[in-house]
């Protein structure tokens, strides 16, 4: 037996041994050995690197009868009798605004993005949005097609 003094108090510390083996070795006999965990490897299919980035939006060309289509939708949702300045009708009612824009998106195949919805305050704003054509080309394609100086070339495959 060994004795220790901790702040004036004497303690007895026993060396814990069972049949001549230290405590750690005694208890380690009862521990189960952990089996090594085999990690299954999953083969990932790697997609080929694109030669050019995918296009963000589809092309849109406004139809010739856009104004008459929009006027018919406005008559359908806001009533058959329209004032002469029907393009200045306010779109404050969110249900009517949603119905109008949803039907136009289905009909024309071009959706008003979320970032522009707050700008659609009047029917004229909707008409102006749908009158703008959208090209299906990226800026790099436009640069490639334009007349570039001889020392500047755009090459997709490198």
From Swiss-Prot:
Coiled coil: none
Keyword Ribosomal protein appears in the UniProt entry: yes
Keyword Ribonucleoprotein among UniProt keywords: yes
Localization per Swiss-Prot or TrEMBL: Mitochondrion
Gene Ontology cellular component list: mitochondrial large ribosomal subunit
InterPro entries according to UniProt: Ribosomal_m50
Entry keywords, A to Z: Mitochondrion, Ribonucleoprotein, Ribosomal protein
Primary localization class, coarse: mitochondrion
Pfam assignment, any one: Ribosomal_L50
Homology family: Belongs to the mitochondrion-specific ribosomal protein mL50 family.
Xref: PANTHER family: 39A RIBOSOMAL PROTEIN L50, MITOCHONDRIAL (PTHR31542), LARGE RIBOSOMAL SUBUNIT PROTEIN ML50 (PTHR31542:SF1)
Oligomeric form and interacting partners: Component of the mitochondrial ribosome large subunit (39S) which comprises a 16S rRNA and about 50 distinct proteins.
Protein name: Large ribosomal subunit protein mL50
Lineage of source species: Eukaryota, Metazoa, Chordata, Craniata, Vertebrata
Gene behind the chain: MRPL50
């Amino acid at each position: 037996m060994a004795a220790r003094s901790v702040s004036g108090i004497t303690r007895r510390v026993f060396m814990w041994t069972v049949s001549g083996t230290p405590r750690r070795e005694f208890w380690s006999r009862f521990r189960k050995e952990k089996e090594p965990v085999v990690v299954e490897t999953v083969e990932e299919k790697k997609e080929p690197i694109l030669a050019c980035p995918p296009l963000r939006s589809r092309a849109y060309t406004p139809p010739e009868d856009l104004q008459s289509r929009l006027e018919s939708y406005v008559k359908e949702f806001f009533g058959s009798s329209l004032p002469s300045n029907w393009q200045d009708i306010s779109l404050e009612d969110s249900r009517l605004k949603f119905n109008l824009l949803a039907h136009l998106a289905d009909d024309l195949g071009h959706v008003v993005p979320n970032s522009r919805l707050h700008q659609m305050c009047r029917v004229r704003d909707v008409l102006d949005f749908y009158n703008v054509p959208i090209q299906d080309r990226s800026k790099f394609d436009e640069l490639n097609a334009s007349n570039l100086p001889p020392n500047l070339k755009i090459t997709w495959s490198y």
